[in-house]
Amino acid sequence: MTLVRLARQEDFDSVAALLVELGRPAVTDRETCLAVYTRDMEDPEAAHLLAEDDEGRVVGFCSLHFRPRLNQVSPQAYVPDLIVTEAARSKKVGHALLSEAENRARRRGCHHLTLESAHWRKDAHRFYLGFGLTDDGLAFGKALV
């Protein structure tokens, strides 16, 4: 059984390890990375969810941000990070995290839940479609630094 709870400041090392496992580009020094994590944890327009297995090991993380949209009265829920350890994939961890994110977004009055996924992450795409998300289009980006 997966326990989903709010992430805390002391979960930093576990969350950082998940980001590394996913291959996310990250700040290289721990002090700066911790400062970024702390800033994000203190954001009132965000929620950060952690998944633990039966033995209390961290097996997943989901960040959820509430963003205003000019064409909507209600905010949009955006998931910039949904990470499940490779060993815990296909064990309903991602489903538990995304379900909690959806529940929080609904309680917040959000009109839409969205996330982005790299085009090559085909297994993740199947999971998202199976969860009920739709392919709403493409995301474009440009590195600025």
Regions found by a protein language model. Give the residues of each.
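Residue-level recognition of the GNAT/N-acetyltransferase active site
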Residues: R67, T85, A118
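Extreme N-terminal starter segment of soluble prokaryotic enzymes
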Residues: M1-V4
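Conserved acetyl-CoA-binding loop-helix of GNAT-fold acetyltransferases
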Residues: V84, S90-N103, G130
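Conserved GNAT acetyl-CoA-binding A-motif
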Residues: L98, A105-E116
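Conserved active-site alpha-helix within GNAT-family acetyltransferase domains
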Residues: H95, R107, H119-L138, K142
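Short acidic/polar active-site loop segments enriched in Thr and Asp
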Residues: A47, H111, T134
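Acetyl-CoA-dependent GNAT
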Residues: L6-D13, A17-S74, P80, L98-S99, ...
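Conserved acetyl-CoA binding element of GNAT-fold acetyltransferases
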Residues: S74-E86, L138
